[in-house]
UniProtKB/Swiss-Prot annotation:
Protein name as annotated: Class I hydrophobin 9
Primary site of residence: secreted
Signal peptide: 1-23
Annotated family: Belongs to the fungal hydrophobin family.
Organism expressing this protein natively: Flammulina velutipes
Cited function: Aerial growth, conidiation, and dispersal of filamentous fungi in the environment rely upon a capability of their secreting small amphipathic proteins called hydrophobins (HPBs) with low sequence identity. Class I can self-assemble into an outermost layer of rodlet bundles on aerial cell surfaces, conferring cellular hydrophobicity that supports fungal growth, development and dispersal; whereas Class II form highly ordered films at water-air interfaces through intermolecular interactions but contribute nothing to the rodlet structure.
Length: 131
């Protein structure tokens, strides 16, 4: 009699735990989606470096439109939603310093970017600058 009761309790617990496990969401996102508003024009016109705040000057290995496939994939993986896909996005960027010498320390694509808050991977709202 005790064995039957133990088996019944075990079966009940197994079913109850299975129901709780099935009710648990599988996709528990820890990184919420970030919407970024950029007011920089989507043009490729070059501006003088003096018209850009020093903290916004970046040296990027690549500068592409936000609508290009590689950039849209990276934005999607990072959970970044842009309101305007006509802006330029810099990839693998680092701040331009005067200490670097030469071209202001940039041998790639010098740009002025509005949003540099995603580390060195991506800068959003970029405009090419002449150093």
């Amino acid at each position: 009699m005790f064995a039957r009761r133990a088996i019944s309790i075990f079966a009940f617990m197994l079913v109850a735990l299975s129901i709780f496990a099935a009710a648990t969401p599988l996709d528990a996102r820890t990184n919420p989606t970030v919407t970024v508003t950029v007011t920089a024009p989507g043009s490729t016109a070059t501006i003088p470096a003096g018209q850009c705040n020093v903290s916004n000057q970046q040296c990027c290995n690549s500068v592409q439109s936000a609508s290009s496939t590689p950039v849209s994939v990276i934005l999607g993986l990072l959970g970044i939603v842009l309101q305007d896909l006509n802006v330029l996005v810099g990839l693998t960027c680092s701040p331009i310093t005067v200490i670097g010498g030469g071209n202001g320390g940039c041998n790639a694509n010098p740009v002025c970017c509005q949003n540099n808050s995603f580390g060195s991977l991506i800068s959003i709202g970029c405009i090419p600058i002449s150093l």
